[in-house]
UniProtKB/Swiss-Prot annotation:
Job of this protein: One of the primary rRNA binding proteins, this protein initially binds near the 5'-end of the 23S rRNA. It is important during the early stages of 50S assembly. It makes multiple contacts with different domains of the 23S rRNA in the assembled 50S subunit and ribosome.
Recorded family membership: Belongs to the universal ribosomal protein uL4 family.
Lineage: Bacteria, Bacillati, Mycoplasmatota, Mollicutes, Mycoplasmataceae
Entries under Pfam families matching the protein: Ribosomal_L4
Protein name stated in the entry: Large ribosomal subunit protein uL4
Keyword RNA-binding annotated: yes
Biological-process GO terms, alphabetical: translation
GO cellular component, one term: ribosome
Length: 208
């Protein structure tokens, strides 16, 4: 497929030929879902923790003698059946929330989301960004020129460009990453994908 490449003033300057296998497939919803769940699960931390009977304070003495009281035998007042006792099989912080997704499914999810951006006219390709210094004001002007200033936008450059990152940091709804940091969740979370020509080629080389 061929798509227009714009300059930062919003002018069409040339066409770029992109691989239909990466940018023009029918989106696979299940692959997208599985990949996002896997990505989100990997971010979870084990923060739940309860004390076992060995960790609860007290309960070192046998509450009453073994025989002769008529009551059930008890070894500790911190056994699980007692109020204030330890918890049996409770949550621990070392739980593993990770959900694995194989490489083929993950790659299919990437191609699906990229194709979805093209299909919905939410992909904008620019030749390059030109900033002499970090400037939020200039970035706002660029986004207005590209007619995406009121959209939640993911900006992707081939490599990390400090001037672009610093120029966009203070703009609400805008996130800037490099091509090797691209992920399905960020792509889905943004309405518009603003990507440089170099970054688009780099992404295509990975998933073609």
């Amino acid at each position: 497929m061929k798509l227009q490449v714009l300059d930062i003033k919003g002018n069409e300057i040339k066409e770029i030929a992109l691989n239909d296998y990466v940018w023009g497939i029918e989106p696979h919803q299940q692959a997208i879902y599985d990949t996002v769940i896997s990505q989100q699960a990997a971010l979870r931390q084990g923060t739940k923790k309860v004390k076992t009977r060995a960790e609860v304070s007290g309960g070192g003495r046998k509450p009453w003698k073994q025989k002769g009281t008529g009551r059930a035998r008890q070894g500790s007042i911190r056994a699980p059946q007692w109020k204030g006792g330890g918890v049996t099989f409770g949550p621990t912080p070392d739980i593993n929330y990770k959900k694995s997704v194989n490489k083929k499914v993950r790659a299919l999810a990437f191609r699906s989301v990229l194709s979805l951006k093209v299909k919905e006219n939410n992909l904008v390709i620019v030749d390059k960004f030109e900033f002499a210094k970090p400037s939020t004001k200039e970035m706002v002007v660029v986004m207005k020129n590209l007619k995406i200033d009121d959209q939640k936008t993911l900006i992707v450059t081939k490599e990390k460009e400090e001037l672009v990152v610093k120029s966009s940091n203070n703009i609400t709804g805008v996130k800037t990453i490099s091509a090797n940091q691209l992920n399905v969740f960020d792509l889905l979370n943004a309405t518009k994908l603003l990507i440089t020509e170099e970054a688009a080629i780099a992404v295509e080389e990975v998933y073609a």
